[in-house]
Amino acid sequence: MAESLLELKKKIASIQKTGQITEAMRMVSGVKLNRTEKLDQEYTIYNDKVRATVSHLMSSQIVKQLGKETKEYNEFGGSASIDYSNFFDLGTLASLVQPRKKIKSTGYLVISGDRGLVGSYNSQVIKNMMSIFKDADAQNKDVKILAVGSVAAQFFKKQNLNVVYEYSGVSDVPTYNEVRDIIQTAVKLYLNGVYDELFVCYTHHVNTLTSAFRVESMLPISDIDINHKDTMPKDYIIEPDIDSVLKTVLPQFSKSMIFGAILDAKTAEHASSMTAMQSASKNADDVVSGLKTKLNRARQAQITTEITEIIGGANALE
């Protein structure tokens, strides 16, 4: 019985130490979450403003050339059907906004983590992507993968998938300069025709307890809202000309969208890590509580046995 009590005490001490570690990790993840969540919210506001400005700038030029109520403009039916070459001379950068006539290859920029202990964060990304790749294979589509995060990169390579680029080691609070190589490579491969469209696949942070897997079309840029019903209260002074401005703004806009996805995914990763460590700490407390109950019962049984033996010995002496 004494050996059993000793084993229980060792188990309790071991699990308590594990619980202390997971609680410390929960607190660290919470601090990281607060930082990236604030940055993510601020960057979303910035990105929305950039999108609105680019959309308004391009709309105003198209409206100016066609006239707000012309038949040609009304027949566009949205930005996807517009031939931008009729309005802008963007050269090779035209493909940033103009869908290619034939899609020969599709690129997927997949964002995962570099480590475990983040709950189902990585497994959900991989599960959803394998479903997408399975559908693409069934349709004989050529797929090229850009993997951000060692977990996804290693898994996809083991599955013999076409990983054309991989990057690991994104910091807990990523900056644009840090991930510049990822962003520039993604855009460069698209402009060079390695793939004809690019989707960014990542986990969107909703709140601490909720996240959602997203597949967003990044290239060609589809978030430009060309709408002839928009009011045009802003007057732009464009120097030197609209084409030069767009040649600078459009690449920056496309890169900012990719960075926004990376920042959002990192926020979701911290939230998942914090939730997982919180759950682990609670489980440790529950196990310790159960073991302490078991220990107390074992002590009571030992004391009862000792008392019985003492009484039995006393009776034998009478």
From Swiss-Prot:
SUPFAM superfamilies: ATP synthase (F1-ATPase), gamma subunit. One of its GO terms (cellular component) is proton-transporting ATP synthase complex. It comes from the Bacteria. It is found in: Cell membrane. GO terms for biological process: proton motive force-driven plasma membrane ATP synthesis. GO terms for molecular function: ATP binding; proton-transporting ATP synthase activity, rotational mechanism. It is a peripheral membrane protein. Keywords: ATP synthesis, Cell membrane, CF(1), Hydrogen ion transport, Ion transport, Membrane, Transport. Its main location: membrane. Belongs to the ATPase gamma chain family. Produces ATP from ADP in the presence of a proton gradient across the membrane. The gamma chain is believed to be important in regulating ATPase activity and the flow of protons through the CF(0) complex. F-type ATPases have 2 components, CF(1) - the catalytic core - and CF(0) - the membrane proton channel. CF(1) has five subunits: alpha(3), beta(3), gamma(1), delta(1), epsilon(1). CF(0) has three main subunits: a, b and c. This is ATP synthase gamma chain. It comes from Lactobacillus gasseri (strain ATCC 33323 / DSM 20243 / BCRC 14619 / CIP 102991 / JCM 1131 / KCTC 3163 / NCIMB 11718 / NCTC 13722 / AM63). The lineage of its organism: Bacteria, Bacillati, Bacillota, Bacilli, Lactobacillales.
